[in-house]
Amino acid sequence: DHRDLHSFPTRRSSDLMPVQTGELREFAIKNELFVLNLNKRQGTSIAGQNTALLKEILAWLEPNAPVYGWEQGVSEDAFVDLVSKSGHPMIPCDWSYNHSLTSLLYSQRQKSTLVRVKNPQFLDYTKKKNFVSFFLSDGDNIQWMMNDFKDFYNAAESEEVRMTYGIAASVLPMMAPAQFDNLLSQQKPNCSILEMLGGGYYYVDNYSENGDRAKNLQVVAERLSAHMRQHRVKLLGVMAMNVKSEAAKEAFQAYVDANDQLEGIVALQYSPYAGGEGDVIWVTNKAGYDIPVITVKYSLWNFGNRNAEREGTPAYIAGRLKQEAQQESFSVVCVHAWSNFSDHGQTEDPLIENQSGDIRGAGAAKLCAGHLNDSFEVVNMQELVWRLRMSQRPEQTKKYLSEVF
């Protein structure tokens, strides 16, 4: 009987699995997890959903306990929203295998592998350009990290466009420490690493709104800080339903309070990614330094026969950036991982790049960068953050660089 929940040995995690999915079965058995299918029929909600049961399980789990897996055939917010509001991170991993083995004795297998970072005091801050940084979406996706993420990560264009890659830098070291070390060892010299999305997939503005939100935000922020500091991850990517909301700002403050080594935050909105319109929100850390939360200004996304206001083809987004060019500006562009484009040279057609292409990730960023002019410079996310800090907070940034480096 599913209502006899006290008979389960652990409330520390649960599995959300599509019907007949076998990849997580051994992990669930070994850890004696409660397993639930959201859809009553595989791949569709047409036969109904076990939503009431899911809510009951989420309320029963310990606060901040992870929910592993995924569900197919429904909008992801249909279940991630419930998981997030209940105070749990979603761990997308329904297509990766053998996590009992990949995570075996993970606490004893932690290496002091460090992310490669730049020393910001050596940047030429007299240079004034329209600085643009591209980063790849979906870095919270564990199964992607375990499978073909390497094809995106090692793309030939990565160095040229100073690509920033989101990685599950707090979850992957526990679920597959060997793969985490492997990915960090392959980081290209001019590419940045961004923790995505704060220790699992959840929305920072509604996380644990059904529980003790302030306490649970502090818990996830402190857990996240430990992992980021251990591996010298200086940048954090988060997602919110409304990146400009007061609830989102409350979460930003929690992350900054917990981590005095955090240099900057990138904020995506669930829909559209660029809902923050490039606005910058400043959050003061405990040492008195203002940390920028940079919202995504545009995203490269293939919508087929149309572009959205702030999402579209490389040519379209480059055109928008050029229209807004100033003496100095700072723009974050998210590259939708699952969008492909085609190369048509210096086209003025805002849609033609959507046609039957296989250019993705850093390749798509290169297409966009190729449409920009000499008033622009493409930099990685860490450099963009420090250039923004020096531009907008020069006195405290100079003070920080003189004291820390």
PLM feature segments, named:
Residues 124-126, 151-159, 172-197, 228, ...:
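Acidic (Asp/Glu)-rich catalytic clusters
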Residues 25-159:
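Non-catalytic propeptide/linker segments at domain boundaries
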Residues 130-133, 161-166, 195-202:
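Glycine-rich, often proline-containing surface loops adjacent to acidic residues and nearby aromatics
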Residues 1-13:
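Short, small-residue-biased leader/transition segments that mark boundaries at the very start
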Residues 178, 184-226, 234:
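Long, K/E/R/D-enriched contiguous segments that form extended
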Residues 49, 175, 216-223, 313-316, ...:
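Soluble or luminal CAZymes and related metallo-dependent hydrolases
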Residues 11-33, 289:
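Acidic, glycine-rich loop-and-strand cores that form catalytic or ligand-binding grooves
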Residues 53-69, 132, 137-163, 170, ...:
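Catalytic grooves of carbohydrate-active enzymes
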